[in-house]
Amino acid sequence: MALVSSAPKSCLHKSLIRSTHHELKPLRRTIPTLGMCRRGKSFTPSVSMSLTTAVSDDGLQRRIGDYHSNLWDDDFIQSLSTPYGEPSYRERAEKLIGEVKEMFNSMPSEDGESMSPLNDLIERLWMVDSVERLGIDRHFKKEIKSALDYVYSYWNEKGIGCGRDSVFPDVNSTASGFRTLRLHGYSVSSEVLKVFQDQNGQFAFSPSTKERDIRTVLNLYRASFIAFPGEKVMEEAEIFSSRYLKEAVQKIPVSSLSQEIDYTLEYGWHTNMPRLETRNYLDVFGHPTSPWLKKKRTQYLDSEKLLELAKLEFNIFHSLQQKELQYLSRWWIHSGLPELTFGRHRHVEYYTLSSCIATEPKHSAFRLGFAKTCHLITVLDDIYDTFGTMDEIELFNEAVRRWNPSEKERLPEYMKEIYMALYEALTDMAREAEKTQGRDTLNYARKAWEVYLDSYTQEAKWIASGYLPTFEEYLENAKVSSGHRAAALTPLLTLDVPLPDDVLKGIDFPSRFNDLASSFLRLRGDTRCYKADRDRGEEASSISCYMKDNPGLTEEDALNHINAMINDIIKELNWELLKPDSNIPMTARKHAYEITRAFHQLYKYRDGFSVATQETKSLVRRTVLEPVPL
């Protein structure tokens, strides 16, 4: 079972871009500044560097977060250009796609006519792994399934060797096969890894600087990421292999192998994203010391053609990203949202996330919808947590419940633009969703947003009253206020897979998947944001509430507990993604799962949205703004 759905060959899909451009409306009017923050002398010092107070034009003293402004000027975004949308690049890519298919088809078969069976299993696994990490697997779904069916036909409880006639299984082939087969929905047990442990449960590897030995442990480490709950051997494999690799990388010269180890140790699996991995692997695969390019051509494999195709596909998609980003930036300008100077404007960063996880050209509606929705969520978060008054928040909630453009007239001036932006974004996404779902999903989505805003309101009440809830009370509300459901629901409905209500409930509220993903997002966010949130007057976090329930615990104790919860959730999410009896299309499961990976990556070092000037800025450049050299 493939993790990525099939897609038509065309990489440009200009029709959506053209249609969305026509939907852009001119700025409705000059936007008044009533309710905006007066920058400058109206700021008054506060007790924290993370919180500032400002006097708004209506005379109220309001709390605002001390966030940096938008990093990506619209003029800069509109000036972006690339030649990779030209037909000649697409034509060359199509030719290479055909040649790579021939590589798959010429692999050794059971009759042994194509090649000796000494390496027929590991070569298939290497090809599948390579096209996936290079970001070109969508073109080879049939070939990948055929290759993995072949490998699986020789799989047994003791693992596999390099070839079908191998007398003994080996760690490298077995770990690679286990990881790839499990990710594609084949039934494989982690018990197979116990074959390579001694009687004390230790993996029998001596320290080595040989590339073959180190790469074997690297593949064991990669396999350990795809753990399900209760798989102790996977935990043991991760502990052993991570320690081994950290020691080994210090002893080998800088090379494609050291670069690959550093990246894998840094990002693992659940803090990674498909396009980010592709961008890194292009450097690894094309490194002068790469063993794959050293081989260059074998009887059926041409690594240079794989690399050329991957670079072309990366850059062709890059041309589509530019068009979508230019549309999104115009939407942001025309929406009036830039006038809300107290808010975090991170539409470019959210688009980067969406295009790093939804890498098929045909999923433009998902990418743009996710970016819009997340940006609206962030601005509303700044209103509900800091800038807005309780009376204003209740007015906004009522306007969303009534769901009529005329409701904006009852709102404060600064809320009118965000209300209309939300109204128009959800309405537009519902139209896109109707094309694939065959029904109007707007009311369903709107109800989800009502619940979401109610959870925000609860947090605002806690802030206003200084109330610190119990951990259970906090987490129950936080599963909704994390925003995962609001961010994911409507974009998922735009995917090209039917999600009738009975199926949708298996991935949306009240499903186990939604519960886990929402809990994960809030808990991971808390571990990175709780100190800054506390400085802004937001006392309630999973850390503080857990400490309240358990007097005598330190912050470090609470953090350790929350991180342990996160690790358990990741394993349960792996199961929800890959369990064999799910009736939810893999495309929908995969995109919902990728959203958790994306947010995990952004929260890896810090709150990468509030502070988007460091790793997040680099992510935008490497995966969206810059093509790779051909």
Curated annotation (Swiss-Prot):
Binds 3 Mg(2+) or Mn(2+) ions per subunit. Keywords: Chloroplast, Lyase, Magnesium, Manganese, Metal-binding, Plastid, Transit peptide. A motif (DDXXD motif) lies at residues 381-385. Pathway: Terpene metabolism; oleoresin biosynthesis. The keyword Manganese applies. Its EC number is 4.2.3.52. GO terms for biological process: diterpenoid biosynthetic process. It is an enzyme of class 4 (lyase). Mg(2+) 1 binds at residues 381, 385. The Asp-Asp-Xaa-Xaa-Asp/Glu (DDXXD/E) motif is important for the catalytic activity, presumably through binding to Mg(2+). Converts geranyl diphosphate to four products with (-)-(4S)-beta-phellandrene (52%) as the major olefin, and lesser amounts of (-)-(1S,5S)-beta-pinene (34%), (-)-1S,5S-alpha-pinene (8.5%), and (-)-(4S)-limonene (6%). Involved in defensive oleoresin formation in conifers in response to insect attack or other injury. Involved in monoterpene (C10) olefins biosynthesis. This is Beta-phellandrene synthase, chloroplastic. It comes from Abies grandis. The lineage of its organism: Eukaryota, Viridiplantae, Streptophyta, Embryophyta, Tracheophyta.
